[in-house]
Amino acid sequence: MNLLKVNDMKILITGTSQGIGKAIAEKFLQNSHEVIGIDRQSSKIDHNNYTHYRLDVRDYANLPEIKNVNILINNAGTQNEDDIDINLKAVIHFTEKYGIQDNIHSVLNIGSASAHTGSEFPEYCASKGGLLAYTKNVAMRVAKFGATCNSLDPGGVMTPLNECVMSDERLWEQIMGETPLKKWATPEEIANWAYFLTVENTFCTGQSIVVDGGESINRKFIWKD
């Protein structure tokens, strides 16, 4: 079966209650895929092809038995004292349980541009940095199935969790001063990248794709007038 010519793949996504995860789920649903979401919050998605499990991604003992997952997207994340457990350990557990099997077409880890710059809280940077190494590990292991594994690493995204940043005029001005494109991504833009990397892409694997409006470049281009 050529998975690129069908739109009935089974997609498992963590962290689908809002923001990036919700946008990714909706993107796949728009393209007629079966989507399964896992989040500790209830879902606002109402669609016949969507199934929601309300549980913590660290609750390994109660994870559902989901067979024949074609695409796994590890999106659930946090920025607190649980960084390592949720952002890294849970990703490893989910991938080993659902992603390393012969029906897999693609694994995508939602990382962070801060993994490349170190410009975040220590535990958060460490968790996302570890994700980069694990992405390469998985890419080597799923290649035998003809599958890919990549990390999609956004910079600023206009999500409800970032409302406190976007509403702080002074902080926002400072951030825009460091961002060449002078804007943040929408969740839908990140969802488009996720769809491309997991469905349309068949050759790029083991890579980290930074989508941050150029912020990580930290460019200082000096040239004569």
Residue ranges and their predicted role:
Residues 17, 25:
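N-terminal Rossmann NAD(P)H-binding glycine-rich loop of SDR-like oxidoreductase domains
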Residues 28, 94, 130, 134-142, ...:
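Hydrophobic alpha-helix immediately C-terminal to the catalytic Tyr-X-X-X-Lys motif of short-chain
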Residues 75-79, 214:
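Conserved NAD(P)H cofactor-binding loop of Rossmann-fold oxidoreductase domains
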Residues 106-130, 135-144, 156-157:
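Catalytic loop of short-chain dehydrogenase/reductase
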Residues 143, 148, 205-207:
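Short, small/polar-rich loop/turn modules that mediate ligand/substrate recognition or access, typified
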Residues 153-164:
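Short, flexible catalytic-loop segment of classical short-chain dehydrogenase/reductase
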Residues 183-211, 216:
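C-terminal substrate-recognition "lid" of short-chain dehydrogenase/reductases
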